[in-house]
Amino acid sequence: NKQGSIGSVTLRGGCFISTSGGYERYEEIDGKRYCHIIDTKTGYPTETDLTTVTVFCDSGLESDFLSTLIFTGGTKEIEKHLSSDNYKIVAADKDKNLYVSDGLDFKLKDGSYKYKQ
């Protein structure tokens, strides 16, 4: 994002990386921020407690799908995905909690974030 990176990931081997978030593409109307990602259940802009989700996966299609799915599902969706053997995630919520998949070589750069267990 424009404020800088939260951290960095060291990858061994190739993979696809997709990030979903509402921090760059949004519209603010009467003080309320509307994300560009549409909730498929309501047809309205997504309301979520996450600010960003990044997925590392062997498939570009899957990484894009998963980053959007997890972002729209919010923090209640994260636990289902943190221990996957098929992909890894890094996500942050509005309270600056950080969610990182087990086994992902992630280095935190921004000390204002804290790891969420």
Spans of features found by a protein language model:
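Mature catalytic core of soluble alpha/beta enzymes
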Residues: N1-Q117
